[in-house]
Amino acid sequence: MPDPITGEGFDAPPPAVAYKVAPDMLSEAASLTELSERLQVEAATASIAGEPYEPDEYQERLYLLRRAALADRLSIAHPEVEEFLNDAVQLAHELAEFDREHDTSEGKYGPGAIEWDPSHRPYVRQEYDKWGW
C-alpha cells in the first residue's frame, strides 16, 4: 500500500527530494505569515473602498502550496504531533481542491488523479518540486 509519509508507492518525489532546497521551516513560517498578512490587507483595503476583491490566483496558489508543504515537512519532522499530521492532510486537500477548481496543477498528475489515493500529501511534493525552489 502506498505510504503518504515516505512517498513510497507514489509517482512523486519523496520528501527528501521535493524539499531539498526548501528554506528552513522557521524562515518559511515567517515568510508565510508576511504573505498571509499582505493578502488580508489587500482584501480589507478593497472592502473598505467598497470594491470587489479578486485575489491574485497565482499568489493564492503559491500561499496554499507553501503552507501545505510546510505542514507536510512539520509532520515528517515531528511524527508524534498529531496536529501536524492533521494539518498536513487538510492543507494538502485544500491545495488539491484549489488546483481542481482553477486548473492550476503544474505536475505530471493532476489533483484528481487516482495516483493520489489515499492522500494528497505526495501531490503537494510533486507540485512543490515542480515549483523549482
Enumerate the language-model features and the residues they cover.
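Long, non-catalytic architectural segments outside compact domain cores
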Residues: M1-Y63, L74-W133
